[in-house]
């Protein structure tokens, strides 16, 4: 525990908890402090001026990160016939219909993204209580209910990141790995923020993008000046 406390003090040293850092400086500080033995995930957190308890202030969407996420994404596809073949050819890890339903109902969920053709949504709907809480339920708003199975699988594998506002008006997104060059991380963050801003709901009032912070898996959170991330 003493060794862990020393490491935490070391990564926090030199960071002003009140200051809003320009994005490039924040990323430099963060990368200097990624000392774990694995490739840490870099995450951005956005505080939005919305109350998601109101339907007209819900924020949800998807962002195709220009430099990928660095993650190996396992994709499951509900499809039959030619669309099932298309999914397999596109690189989907699991493809099925009733058989996939039974596998999931049996408690085996070995995927990170779930895609379905529209005709199979009545079947997939039976998994709402299982997939919904895990953020895996296919949804046309984020392109995971579609006949373009090939495109959806490619997007998921290539770094598409779904986002959804939480109760406190916060959105989190993993936007890359500590091994990424800082400029690539910055491009991903700006693309992610742009996607969230474009998803601004009609019911949002006042300042929409209120606070921005970046962090790593084992590192500190660093506050970022919003104007260096997105220009309104």
Curated annotation (Swiss-Prot):
GO terms for molecular function: rRNA binding; structural constituent of ribosome; tRNA binding. It comes from the Bacteria. InterPro entries: Ribosom_uL1_bac-type, Ribosomal_uL1, Ribosomal_uL1-like, Ribosomal_uL1/biogenesis, Ribosomal_uL1_3-a/b-sand, Ribosomal_uL1_CS. Gene3D superfamilies: 3.30.190.20, 3.40.50.790. Keywords: Repressor, Ribonucleoprotein, Ribosomal protein, RNA-binding, rRNA-binding, Translation regulation, tRNA-binding. It holds the Pfam family Ribosomal_L1. GO terms for cellular component: cytosolic large ribosomal subunit. One of its GO terms (biological process) is regulation of translation. PANTHER family: 54S RIBOSOMAL PROTEIN L1, MITOCHONDRIAL (PTHR36427), LARGE RIBOSOMAL SUBUNIT PROTEIN UL1M (PTHR36427:SF3). Part of the 50S ribosomal subunit. Belongs to the universal ribosomal protein uL1 family. Binds directly to 23S rRNA. The L1 stalk is quite mobile in the ribosome, and is involved in E site tRNA release. Protein L1 is also a translational repressor protein, it controls the translation of the L11 operon by binding to its mRNA. This is Large ribosomal subunit protein uL1.
């Amino acid at each position: 525990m003493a060794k862990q406390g020393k490491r935490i003090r070391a990564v926090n040293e030199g960071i002003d908890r009140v200051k809003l850092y320009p994005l490039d400086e924040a990323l430099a500080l963060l990368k200097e402090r990624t000392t774990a033995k694995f490739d840490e995930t870099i995450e951005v957190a956005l505080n939005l001026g919305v109350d998601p308890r109101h339907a007209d202030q819900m924020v949800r969407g998807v962002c195709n990160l220009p430099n990928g996420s660095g993650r190996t994404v396992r994709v499951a596809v509900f499809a039959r016939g030619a669309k099932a073949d298309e999914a397999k050819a596109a690189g989907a890890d699991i493809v099925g219909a009733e058989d996939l339903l039974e596998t999931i109902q049996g408690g085996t969920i070995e995927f990170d993204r779930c895609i379905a053709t529209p005709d199979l949504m009545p079947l997939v709907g039976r998994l709402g209580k299982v997939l919904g809480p895990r953020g895996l339920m296919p949804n046309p708003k984020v392109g995971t209910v579609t006949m373009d199975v090939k495109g959806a699988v490619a997007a998921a594998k290539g770094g598409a990141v779904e986002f959804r506002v939480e109760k406190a008006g916060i959105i989190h997104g993993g936007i890359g790995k500590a091994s990424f060059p800082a400029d690539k991380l910055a491009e991903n963050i700006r693309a992610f923020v742009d996607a969230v801003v474009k998803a601004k709901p009609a019911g949002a009032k006042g300042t929409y993008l209120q606070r921005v912070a970046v962090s790593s898996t084992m590192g500190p959170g660093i506050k970022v000046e919003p104007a260096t991330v997105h220009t309104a």
